[in-house]
Structure formats: structure tokens, C-alpha cells
Amino acid sequence: MTNKYLSFITDEDLFECIEFLYTEYEKALEGIDFDKFFKNRIDTFKMTFDMGINNLSEQDWLAAELQRQVEKTITNHVGTFHEKLIGKIEGYTNYPVGYDYDVAKDDNTLFAEIKNKHNTLTGTHTKSLFQKICGYAEKYPDAICYYVRIIDTKSRNDIWEFRSGSIDENTREKPRFSHPRVRIASGDQFYKIVTGEEDAFKQLAYNIPIALDDWIETKRAKKGSSLGLFAELYQQAKANNRTLSEEIISINYPKSNYISF
């Protein structure tokens, strides 16, 4: 068991988490066939400006558009990647979908709900998550419970306090939500908590690119999954004596029954 990349997780465990995320990337991109690509319609004006202003080739634009279409799915899976990674740390367990919490310390003194970005939750979802985490705190009186935002606007490890709901007629303020053992933590702070190492998140940020390249090289995995769709569109454009952009325009708008197409 070696620790070439991270001091707190073995290379084997890290590679297992990388393989999970790589597989999810492949599923998401390969799941976009010809029909799905055009399902929500392409903004061909933005396409034209993107390629012209950013000096993108047609294939580069297509790869970027595919990435945009799967962005939400991939972002969720990156959050799961962190859950799985933290679950590999000694003394912690990652729980699959269906359990009340994402990660817990085996002695029941820490529970966490992990989101990948600070803007994942909005409105009533914030209140619902808070109440859910409060439930862990009430059930386990010795536990500190966390709402973790891996990519946050600042480094933090604070009691989670916020206001939400209708404004009270007397106080002229929205109801305040807080619990002494429910905290909000950024990715750097939470990795420090679960590993005991100040630079744990920094290690991860700098060494993931190296580990990913090594894993891809070892597995001889392919980079990028847009070539199949590109080839299909290119061959169709060639047969119709059009550029790729013209072919996308000719497919896109008739699907919405636009005038003159």
C-alpha cells in the first residue's frame, strides 16, 4: 500500500475513486446520442460567436457543448467522488444513496452532508437540509454535524446560521435557524477535520491531476468521448455539402418547426 499522491489515502483507494468518476463521465457523455444532443435545441448564434471569438474549431466547440450538456450530472458525481474519498479515510464510512447521511465517523461523533458547490442549494432546500442535519444532532448528542460545501466562497468552519421564510410582523425579520452542533464547513476545513492534516485539501488539489494522468496511462483509458457524435455529424454534413455549423442549423430549427427551415 503506497501513498504517492496523498498522505491520508492509499494510491489504490484514490485510484478506485478516480475510476468511479471516470466511469460516470463516460456514461454521461456516451449517453448523448444524436437525438439527445438536439433535444433542448442548440443556440446556433452563441455557437457562431463562441467559435469565432474564442477561435474554436468545430470539434472543439462540439466537445465544449457536450461538456455543458452534462455539467449538472457531472457536478453531482464530483460531489460523490469526495464522499467516496472521505469514506476511505480510516475511521470514516461513506454511505450510499438511500441513507440519511453521506459520511459518518464510525464512532458516531461526526455526520456530514456533502455538496460539491456553494450554490447547489437554494430557498426551501436549504431549510430542509438544515432540519435533516439537525435530526442527526438530536439523535446523537455527542456528534458534531456538518453541511460541507467542497467548493465554497471562503474557508469556513462555523455554526450554520441563516434566516429563511416569511418576515415576522413584530421583528420585521425572517425566522432564524441555528443549532449549536450543526456547522457549515468548506472543503479545505472539512478535509482538515477528517484527516487531521492542515494541507489535506491542498494535497488533493495539486495531486489529483497527476494521479488522474497516471491512472489513465495505467488503464490505457481514452480521453474525450465526443468523436463518435462528431463523426456522425461530420459525415452527414459532408453528404449534404454543408459545413458542420450549417448542418447543426439545418437539424436544430426544423425540430421546433421554425419558419422557413
UniProtKB/Swiss-Prot annotation:
Any single biological process term in GO: DNA restriction-modification system
EC numbers on record: 3.1.21.4
Enzyme class: hydrolase
Keywords attached to this entry: Endonuclease, Hydrolase, Nuclease, Restriction system
Recorded catalytic activity of this chain's protein: Endonucleolytic cleavage of DNA to give specific double-stranded fragments with terminal 5'-phosphates
Signal peptide residue numbers: none
Top-level taxon: Bacteria
Claim: Nuclease is one of the keywords in the record: yes
Molecular function GO labels: DNA binding; type II site-specific deoxyribonuclease activity
Subunit description: Monomer.
Name used for this protein in its record: Type II restriction enzyme Sau96I
Primary gene name: sau96IR
